[in-house]
Amino acid sequence: MLRRALLCLAVAALVRADAPEEEDHVLVLRKSNFAEALAAHKYLLVEFYAPWCGHCKALAPEYAKAAGKLKAEGSEIRLAKVDATEESDLAQQYGVRGYPTIKFFRNGDTASPKEYTAGREADDIVNWLKKRTGPAATTLPDGAAAESLVESSEVAVIGFFKDVESDSAKQFLQAAEAIDDIPFGITSNSDVFSKYQLDKDGVVLFKKFDEGRNNFEGEVTKENLLDFIKHNQLPLVIEFTEQTAPKIFGGEIKTHILLFLPKSVSDYDGKLSNFKTAAESFKGKILFIFIDSDHTDNQRILEFFGLKKEECPAVRLITLEEEMTKYKPESEELTAERITEFCHRFLEGKIKPHLMSQELPEDWDKQPVKVLVGKNFEDVAFDEKKNVFVEFYAPWCGHCKQLAPIWDKLGETYKDHENIVIAKMDSTANEVEAVKVHSFPTLKFFPASADRTVIDYNGERTLDGFKKFLESGGQDGAGDDDDLEDLEEAEEPDMEEDDDQKAVKDEL
């Protein structure tokens, strides 16, 4: 009997030893307890992270806050995390290629976990999970329930319908199903109508900023409601942070105007107020974003726009379509009137894209590898009598650093050639209309001709590979730019130094 009891205790101890630990209400998972956690929890959100990842560090307190909130509510949803650098088998199994990667598991299903796509604040996480595990809109039986919903999040939407089976109510529910990161409620209770000053059916968006609420006007259709929410769910001016980035770059509005403003500047409040005043005229058309130009985490954003801290305050506009295009105001005045005028002229198509360029170094052509900037690119690359091979690089790029000595040797090889030029251009500081650079390094060949031909190089990055390409007139090693981009994306996650810059590239 004693032996059996001891055996049971030993088995129980082993089970407990392998059970997930908790850190700030977040389950700590490993390969040894991952399956057990999936079996124990109907809904499980898992973050695959790396200890060195800045984005993961920024997410950690919000992730823990969300976990604590759900646990306190007695929810069936649990949050967990996996150190992907230690648990490489799990990371590979679930296709982790960047950090953080967050996946949602339902009923232990490991075949098709859902990718988490919402923001990185606690409310965003909780709202997304509740929408994934519950009804599209919560039924609100009384004023207390409605007030609780409104107070629970930065933004909430309530549909007021005297008949919740009406066509309008059904359109409302369809809109609710389409949005993951905002809580929706629906009510037919007359007291709730009175509480929020409604005497007929309607939809109201409640928010803890700007005007506080927006009443929907017009025909209640899914499309109209989604458009209404898109126009009103973000503040007139939203600060760019680690937490707000997914809302900014994942939203429907792809034209962004950015105010680079140090919070330490003496007239900070006045300049921000001017920016906000201008924003009132462009809701739903242009997203107004404020960036603290003094903050260390934002320096690479400044670099992307060719700005230095001492040049701020400054305004820039960017379109986030397939080809990102930047625009610069003609005036440096940051009054509401000037910013409004700039936005109107942009929307009317009267503003030309802004292309960055460094100053041309005096010795740009004194070395075997010629230095190109925006100002001399056209003259050199499209010289009808020269075959020009150009490396478009970024100073921070690990692949570019590896290529540098080989590229220098290539320059030495052809320094005395009468019609072959080896060149390089820093694409983080220089832009040209003729070439769009999507990854680093990008290698392009400009053969001697009058038709402005551009050939992408996608061969081996070796001296012999480059020489064969040049001696073949740009044939041996030629390939599509898309192929090169795929190669870079496959390689980059292994380069830790590129993590932050890759995030900037992905977001911008």
Curated annotation (Swiss-Prot):
Q: Where is this site: Contributes to redox potential value?
A: 54-55, 398-399
Signal peptide: which range, if any? 1-17
Catalyzed reactions: Catalyzes the rearrangement of -S-S- bonds in proteins
Assigned EC number: 5.3.4.1
Q: Cross-referenced CDD domains, in alphabetical order?
A: PDI_a_family, PDI_a_PDI_a'_C, PDI_b'_family, PDI_b_family
Disease note: Cole-Carpenter syndrome 1: A form of Cole-Carpenter syndrome, a disorder characterized by features of osteogenesis imperfecta such as bone deformities and severe bone fragility with frequent fractures, in association with craniosynostosis, ocular proptosis, hydrocephalus, growth failure and distinctive facial features. Craniofacial findings include marked frontal bossing, midface hypoplasia, and micrognathia. Despite the craniosynostosis and hydrocephalus, intellectual development is normal. CLCRP1 inheritance is autosomal dominant.
Name assigned to this protein: Protein disulfide-isomerase
Origin species, per record, is Homo sapiens
